[in-house]
Structures are given as structure tokens and as C-alpha cells.
Amino acid sequence: MNKSWLAIIFLIISNQAMTQTSHFEPQQPLQGSGAINIVVSNLDEKEGDTYFAEAEKNERNGELNEAVTLFGKAAFEYNSSKQLARYGEALMRLSNVHYQLAHFVEAEQVVLNVALKNYSKMGSRNGQMESYSQLGRIYLALNKPTQSLWFYTQQGILAKQIGNNSAFIESVLGMANVKIRKKEYSLAAKDLNRAEVLAKSANIHEFKNQIKDARSMLPAIAAAKPAKKSSKKK
């Protein structure tokens, strides 16, 4: 496991714990401390933005190990300045880079132990939905189909609740891929047909290639679309 990543996550979790315990400690009021806190918070946020931008640049250039370090630093700075939305975004990007590096356990831990808790604390259903989607992908890569299917199902439930058609179709596709892995080809074909119908009715074209690629992994019989019933009478 990447030592720099471990150090960053330890610092983030430690900072969260210090923030929580500070509520129970009696503190003496310091004159002018409010202005100092605002300045420090703004500096932390700006540092976070700088790290985040550099991390994106490294990711685009394929320098993924550097991107891991910088997204971790950005997450730490955003957490310090209580920019929870940006904190969550940095964590999700950190997890995604780990995923690209095939560091699936690290990718899982960032989302499961940190990002998902952050989004739950915020009450962000979009953030939770994104976390479920990422965990679905990660567990499929880890060959844990039961967990993967559960998280894709949770993504679909939230997507339906908030009316996000793209995320719902993505969850159906995720479930289809899990069923392909489990060799449940008939069930997978039904999910792919459902995803295709939903995408067409919502006029969403981004999943066309994904559906095509998933169908290519099905045996010929399972991949065949159901024939339309003839309306002609004998």
C-alpha cells in the first residue's frame, strides 16, 4: 500500500477527530481569533485548489503516482478549511486514480471510510450516489460480485429518488456487468435491453458504446434481442 497515501489519509482522519473532540474542550475566547481563522481557512482552500489543479494536470499526463499524492494533499487542505463539497470531490478523484493504477483496495478505502461518510454528513445524495457507483466498479474489479451488485442497486435507488436518468441507466449497466461476470447471461441481457430502452426514451446517447461492448461479452443466444410480436392475424 502506498506509504504517502497512508500518511495523507491518516492526517485527514486525525484532523477530523481533532475537529470533533474540540467541541468538548473548554476554550478561552481569543480576541480577534475570528479574523485569523478566516484568513487561515482561505489560505487552506487556495492551497487545496493549487494541489487539485496540479493533480488534474498530472493525471492528464499519465503521471498517476504524483496525482495520488496531490489529490490527497488537496483533500487534506479542503478538509482543514471545511470545504466539504471540494473535499469530497478530491477524495473521489483520489479513489479514481487509485482505480486506474489497479490499487483497488486503496480506492475502496478512500470511498468507503472517508468520502461516503463525508457525503452522509453533508446530506448530499448526489455524493452518496457517486460513491455507490464507484464502489460498484471497485468491487467488480476485486471480483466481489455480491458487494458490487449491492452498491449498484443503491445507486439506482438514489438515482430514481432524485430523478437522475443518466445515473439510473449507469446503475442498470453496472448490474448487467456484474451478471455477466457471474455468467448469468440471460439476466444480463435483460438489463442491457432495459438500459437501451431507457436511454432511447430519455434521448441519452452516452451509453451506446458501453451497451454494445457489454453485449459483445454475451453468448450469441443470450445477446439476441427478443423478436417483436407480429400484429398480423391469420
Model-derived regions, located:
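Intrinsically disordered, low-complexity regions
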Residues: 1-234
